[in-house]
C-alpha cells in the first residue's frame, strides 16, 4: 500500500462533545466528526454544545462534515435533533430496534451512514438492502451501538466490496496496520482517542489523524 492510499483514507472522529476538540479535528484534517445523541452513551452531547460546534463549522471553510449519531432514540427525538441542527449526514445502527425500515429509508434524511455490527463473517449479500451512502463496520456489543473500544476479526469482512469505514478498537498504535490489512475507505474512532469514557484527549486525536495520514 503506497503513501497516497493513507493520504486518501477518510477519517471520522466520533463522540465529540466540546468545541476545542472540534477545532483540532478541523485543523488536523479530519473528514467527518460525529455528534452522539445516544441516550446511554458517555459521549452524549447536549443540543446547546452541539450547536456551538455546528455554528463554528458553518462559519469556517474546509470543515469536516457533521454526522449526527443515533441509537435507541425514538423517532421523535431524532426529529427534534435533526430539525434543530445543521448536519451533513445521519448515522444509525442497522439493527436498532426503535427504527422501522420505513423510518430508515424515508425519515432519516438524504445522506446516511449505517453502522453494521460484526460478530461473524459477512458478505456483500448481507449488506445489499442497506439504503445508506456509507457503511461503518464495527464491533458487536449487545447493549452498545458502538464505541466499545474492542476490535473484531477483520477476516470477517475480507470479501466486502462496498465502501465502508472501519471501526472498533482503533487507536494511534494500530490504525495504520488496520488500513494496510483491511484497506477500508476510511476509519472511525471514538474511545481510542479518549483519556476516559466520553473525554477526548487532544494529543490522542492529533496523533491518530497524523498516523493515518503518514501511514505510521
UniProtKB/Swiss-Prot annotation:
GO biological process: L-tryptophan biosynthetic process
Entry-linked Pfam families: PRAI
Primary enzyme class: isomerase
Presence of keyword Amino-acid biosynthesis: yes
InterPro entries xref list: Aldolase_TIM, PRAI_dom, RibuloseP-bd_barrel, TrpF_fam
UniProt keyword annotations, A-Z: Amino-acid biosynthesis, Aromatic amino acid biosynthesis, Isomerase, Tryptophan biosynthesis
Record-linked CDD domains: PRAI
Catalytic activity: N-(5-phospho-beta-D-ribosyl)anthranilate = 1-(2-carboxyphenylamino)-1-deoxy-D-ribulose 5-phosphate
Enzyme Commission number: 5.3.1.24
A GO MF label: phosphoribosylanthranilate isomerase activity
Family: Belongs to the TrpF family.
Name this polypeptide is given: N-(5'-phosphoribosyl)anthranilate isomerase
Gene name in the database record: trpF
